[in-house]
């Protein structure tokens, strides 16, 4: 009972969720029962005749069941199809581990349907085990022990199942650089010790088809020789792909399939083939010829994801038997490949039988429930209720660990369609097992109404009644098929009910009857919809104090605009009509530079409230008023002859007043200083002018010329005097130097250039004697 409690809680949660969803229904643009069913899981359709009133749309028929009942629709007339699930149990005596085998679902859009799938782990289920071994030179000791494993492997399988078979295959790597040495001698014997007999390298060789003959296993494996390659990673993924893609060649039965992958190193994967100029992606197909993968140099290595998909598709559970240094690497690989296990292999593979037994027990005690590829319109989730008391809900796949023999576990599968789907099917299976559940999916979008007939009295003899709504014959339209199209298409008639091509018919608020909009009656009290295209109403206007247009005493709403009473104004009739707060001292509204709205000045750009009297940022028109200032004050200038006409708007003030100071030249070049005072209105100024003009006298030409000439002459004379003084000082300095040299001179009678013609030579021997 305790184990069933999570299931009961989940079912209660689902019912509560559906109850919440059933309280909502979006019925916009709904005209048929099918449209209603598609619009939401909480919608229902009332097929009662004459359920809609005058001017009401057919979408009124679509609502939640509670709302339809409250509107007077009898419960028998409410169409509310539900999602359903029908299951067919397996035949008695069948060894199927999954039940049921077939499920038929009728899916309504947005409404989930749930059904249970039970898995019961069978005892002694048949097993096929394929031993795939790395024959690179580093595995030479392992091969010796594997050659003796045939009997031990079969005995181990027979301890688990009544029917076990074993097979064998081997791999090295692609036979191109840089994976193997392509020197002809090295291709014949790739082993480092030339005296040792080795076989040429190869990608994958299928040695023995799955069999229950242990002697044959030992015989065929005993013929195998070690090989070799260059780099550390091996081509194991290539070999695994061929084992999964060639079921007939390998001899797989429709039973539990185990693939033991034995190696002491890593693996190449997609993209590594480019190192050997192999660019074509792996196609995931079988390419065995004479039990050899001869196309390995044409296709790149498979990706891990590609291999995982192929293994799952073929129901193959890999067991990675690897040495201690590679355990962590292959544990990462098992995180990507579902239903796989890793075991630590001894250096000489002595423990491989025990490793396989432990890995099988680990794999068979965990169950993953998954489904085949689905379209985007279908969503499948799983709730797992495991035998160990643990549960998971709303997961992308079912998952239970610690599964025991003959102890059932339950998965609740929930399927939801996002729209009305086409009839289709998919399969659910436990990964690594051959049993499947076939799920057939059909749409649940039609209403089984009772009134489908051609009763002439209902639709005027021009149509049939379907779910309470008339479906008119060709040439007639209208709620009761009362309108004859007279050769016009329905598109043409609908076009006259659209404001423009981008708008919807009758603004979505009316029905197009004979090319004219008949507006709906609104559910909102006192709301009236009107207009040629039903585009207007009497409530969608601005509100003041919580009421449309401030209430009926202030104004009424007409098609989005408030029409105010004579005493009120404003976009929402929020203001009394008054200008008292907008008048300046002279009684001018907003100083003539703005408009009074709601008793507040709305000033022209630049002018400041409250009365629009100042404009700090506006330029002062000093230059523009200079001619009028000159003629008004001094009776001269360009406007002297018609000053009163040209400057009639400008008043000359006799006393100084505060305003904008100006200083401009008059027509004679004199400076005028005056003050502009702005009056009410725009560009209207009074002016006060200072009495005195600032006139600058002309320059003295003679003084300027005389001074210039005199200055040039004086500069020339000064330069000559300086030059003369400098030359005199230089001559004086040279004269004094000459005098000093003269005093130092000593004269005699000898000619310093004369040399005597007589030469005297002394004999050194003569001196000694």
Swiss-Prot record:
Cytoplasmic side: 724-769
UniProt name for this protein: Integrin beta-2
Positions in the Extracellular compartment: 23-700
GO-annotated molecular function: amyloid-beta binding; integrin binding; metal ion binding; protein kinase binding
InterPro entries: EGF_extracell, Integrin_b-2_sf, Integrin_beta_N, Integrin_bsu, Integrin_bsu_cyt_dom, Integrin_bsu_tail, Integrin_bsu_tail_dom_sf, Integrin_bsu_VWA
Free-text domain note: The VWFA domain (or beta I domain) contains three cation-binding sites: the ligand-associated metal ion-binding site (LIMBS or SyMBS), the metal ion-dependent adhesion site (MIDAS), and the adjacent MIDAS site (ADMIDAS). This domain is also part of the ligand-binding site.
Modifications made to the protein after synthesis: Both Ser-745 and Ser-756 become phosphorylated when T-cells are exposed to phorbol esters. Phosphorylation on Thr-758 (but not on Ser-756) allows interaction with 14-3-3 proteins.
Localisation per UniProt entry: Cell membrane; Membrane raft
Motif range (Cell attachment site): 397-399
Disease entry from the Swiss-Prot or TrEMBL record: Defects in ITGB2 are the cause of leukocyte adhesion deficiency (LAD). All cattle with the mutant allele are related to one bull, who through the use of artificial insemination sired many calves in the 1950s and 1960s.
Residues with Pyrrolidone carboxylic acid modification: 23
Signal peptide bounds: 1-22
First-listed, main subcellular location of the protein, grouped into a coarse class: membrane
Phosphoserine sites (modified residues): 745, 756
């Amino acid at each position: 009972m305790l184990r069933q409690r999570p299931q009961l809680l989940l079912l209660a949660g689902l019912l509560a969720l559906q109850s919440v969803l059933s309280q909502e229904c979006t019925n916009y643009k709904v005209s048929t029962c099918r449209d209603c069913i598609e619009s939401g899981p909480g919608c229902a359709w009332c097929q009662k005749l004459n359920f809609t009133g005058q001017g009401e749309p057919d979408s009124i028929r679509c609502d939640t069941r509670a709302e339809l009942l409250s509107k007077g629709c009898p419960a028998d007339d409410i169409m509310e199809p539900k999602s359903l699930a029908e299951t067919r149990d397996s035949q008695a005596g069948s060894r199927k581990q999954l039940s049921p085998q077939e499920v038929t679902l009728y899916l309504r859009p947005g409404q989930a349907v749930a059904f249970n799938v039970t898995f019961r782990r069978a005892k002694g289920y048949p097993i096929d085990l394929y031993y795939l071994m790395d024959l690179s030179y580093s595995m030479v000791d392992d091969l010796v022990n594997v050659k003796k494993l045939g009997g031990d492997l079969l005995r181990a399988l027979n301890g688990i199942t009544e029917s076990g078979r074993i097979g064998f295959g081997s791999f090295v790597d692609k036979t191109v650089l840089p994976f193997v040495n392509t020197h002809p001698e090295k291709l014949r014997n790739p082993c480092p010790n030339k005296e040792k007999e080795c076989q040429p390298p190869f990608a994958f060789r299928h040695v023995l088809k799955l069999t229950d003959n242990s002697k044959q296993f030992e015989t065929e494996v005993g013929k195998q020789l070690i090989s070799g390659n260059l780099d550390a990673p091996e081509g194991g993924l290539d070999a695994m792909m061929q084992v999964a893609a060639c079921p007939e060649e390998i001899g797989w039965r429709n039973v539990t399939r185990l693939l033991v992958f034995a190696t002491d190193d890593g693996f190449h994967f997609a993209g590594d083939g480019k190192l050997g100029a192999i660019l074509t992606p792996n196609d995931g197909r079988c390419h065995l010829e004479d039990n050899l993968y001869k196309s390995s140099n044409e296709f790149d290595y498979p990706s891990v994801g590609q291999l995982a998909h192929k293994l799952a598709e073929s129901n193959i559970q890999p067991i990675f038997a690897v040495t201690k240094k590679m355990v962590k690497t292959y544990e990462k690989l098992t995180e990507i490949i579902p239903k796989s296990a890793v075991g630590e292999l001894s250096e000489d593979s002595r423990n491989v039988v025990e490793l396989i037994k432990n890995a099988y027990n680990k794999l068979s005690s965990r169950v993953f429930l998954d489904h085949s590829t689905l379209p985007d319109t279908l969503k499948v989730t799983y709730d797992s209720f495991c035998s160990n008391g643990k549960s998971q809900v709303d997961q992308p796949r079912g998952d239970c660990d610690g599964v025991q023999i003959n102890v059932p576990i339950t998965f609740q599968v929930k399927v939801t369609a996002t729209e009305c789907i086409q009839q289709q099917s998919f399969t659910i299976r436990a990964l690594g097992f051959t049993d499947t559940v076939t799920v057939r999916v059909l749409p649940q979008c039609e209403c089984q109404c009772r009134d489908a007939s051609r009763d002439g009295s209902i639709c005027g003899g021009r149509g049939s009644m379907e779910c309470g709504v008339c479906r008119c014959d060709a040439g007639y339209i209208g709620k009761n098929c009362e309108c004859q199209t007279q050769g016009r298409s329905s598109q043409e008639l609908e076009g006259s009910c659209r404001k423009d091509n981008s708008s919807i018919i009758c603004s979505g608020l009316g029905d197009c009857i004979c090319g004219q909009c008949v507006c709906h009656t609104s559910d909102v009290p006192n709301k009236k919809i009107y207009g040629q295209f039903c585009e207007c109403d009497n409530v969608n206007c601005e509100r003041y104090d919580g009421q449309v247009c401030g209430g009926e005493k202030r104004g009424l709403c007409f098609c989005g605009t408030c029409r105010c009473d004579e005493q009120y104004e404003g976009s929402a009739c929020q203001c009394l009509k008054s200008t008292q707060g907008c008048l300046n001292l002279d009684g001018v509204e907003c100083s003539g530079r703005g408009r009074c709205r709601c008793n507040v000045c709305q000033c022209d750009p630049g002018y400041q409230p409250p009365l629009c009297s100042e404009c700090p940022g506006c330029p002062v028109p000093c230059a523009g008023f200079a001619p009028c200032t000159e003629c008004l004050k001094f009776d001269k200038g360009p406007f002297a002859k018609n000053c009163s006409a040209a400057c009639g708007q400008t008043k000359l003030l006799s006393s100084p007043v505060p305003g904008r100071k100006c200083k401009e030249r008059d027509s004679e070049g004199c400076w005028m200083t005056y003050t502009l005072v702005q009056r009410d209105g725009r560009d209207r100024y009074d002016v006060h002018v200072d009495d005195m003009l600032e006139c600058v006298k002309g320059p003295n030409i003679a003084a300027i010329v005389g001074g210039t000439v005199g200055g040039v002459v004086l500069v020339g004379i000064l330069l000559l005097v300086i030059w003369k003084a400098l030359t005199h000082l230089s001559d004086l300095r040279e004269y004094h130097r000459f005098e000093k040299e003269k005093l130092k001179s000593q004269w005699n009678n000898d000619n310093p250039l004369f040399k005597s013609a007589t030469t005297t030579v002394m004999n050194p021997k003569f001196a000694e004697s």
